[in-house]
Design a protein with these regions (language model features):
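Domain-level marker for long, solvent-exposed, non-transmembrane regions
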Residues: 1-181
Length: 181
């Protein structure tokens, strides 16, 4: 078992799944007058024109298994049977890119163009939206399957039969708790 632990700990972080996402962040900016007059709320769009922007974003999300806390307690051997309990996959947004040539703006003549600060703010909102959409992907399940496909051959090389090896994880995730990764 110590040899197994040492072999697995050599991996440190094992990146097992990657997901590419494309998102178009849009914003519609109208000038309006809000207020209250004689206890009546009003909201009037002013005819000075509107501004619209569409920002295409590409993002890369990666899932990995962090073996820094992996120990002998994670491996249970019962005769020829081997049960390996792996740490839960972790998910991170590793990169985002914006094709600036594809950014589209519509600005009425009576309005000013979007400032760099406004565009940066919309890009940040896009990144947050991508992170919020991670639970809809199946990247955690892909990471688990890939980790098993990578580790089982290592155990087979050490003399175990593939049919006697069970790889499991600590926790089952659903869309309500996947954001905790």
């Amino acid at each position: 078992i110590p040899t197994l632990v040492m072999q697995i700990q050599k991996c440190s972080k094992l990146y097992t799944a990657e997901c590419k996402m494309h998102k178009i962040v849009t914003h519609d900016d109208k000038v309006s007058l809000h207020g209250k007059f004689m206890e009546t709320d009003y909201n009037i769009d002013l005819p000075v024109g509107s501004r619209k922007v569409a920002i295409p974003m590409d993002a890369t999300i990666k899932a990995y298994i962090d073996f820094s806390s992996f120990s002998e307690a994670s491996i249970l051997r019962n005769g020829d049977k081997l049960n390996v309990v792996l740490p839960d996959p972790k998910v991170q947004l590793t990169s985002t890119s914006i094709n600036h040539e594809e950014v589209k703006q519509f600005v009425a003549l009576t309005r000013s163009r979007f400032t760099d600060e406004e565009l940066t703010n919309y890009e940040q909102q896009g990144r947050k939206a991508i992170i919020a959409d991670i639970p809809q992907t199946n990247i955690v399940e892909q990471a688990r399957e890939s980790a098993a496909r990578i580790l089982i051959p290592m155990f087979v090389q050490m003399g175990f039969k593939e049919a006697d090896i069970t790889v499991s994880f600590r926790k089952d995730f659903n869309k309500n708790n996947i954001g905790l990764l």
